[in-house]
Amino acid sequence: KIKEGQDKLYDVAADNYSTAKNSPSLEVFKQKDIEVLLLSDRIDEWLMSHLMEHEGKQLQDVTKGSLDLGDLEGEEEKQEQEKIEEDFKELVERIKDVVGEKVEEVRITHRLTDSPACLVVNEDEMGMQMRRILESAGQEVPATKRIFELNPKHPLVEKLKAEQDSERFSDLTLVLFDQSM
């Protein structure tokens, strides 16, 4: 069922239904009661990469790129997100220094409501399920760097922001990064 003002159909592809259903990328959709297609067949991600729209609605993988809910978010919500991003700029830079070349980018996200962090791929990159399929078939898969997204409202991220000890900050950052994989 599509909500009023919804201009995209959202989907998530995973190895199985349970993994798709429990993806951290779905948290904001659950909170806003937006339905997402849960895809668990091996061919689904490939198929969705070739289907650009359905009945005039653009299809969007919720685990790729930046998340734009369009008219489903009010102007006030968008302004609050921009303010939060500004407040966390210093933390983002500190985390970039720690994770360095492991990621393409570190950024604050509103995609997460319960989880402290997640990794997403760029909009035009191959998804993780497709990578696993190709690797299991013995195909060479191009190396890509993912985007490390942080939930600014999570207590762990807030603790990280306040951490002054650089060694402890690095350790906590790397644990958070590893848990996101």
Where are these regions (language model features)?
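Long, intrinsically disordered, charge-dense linkers/tails
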Residues: 1-181
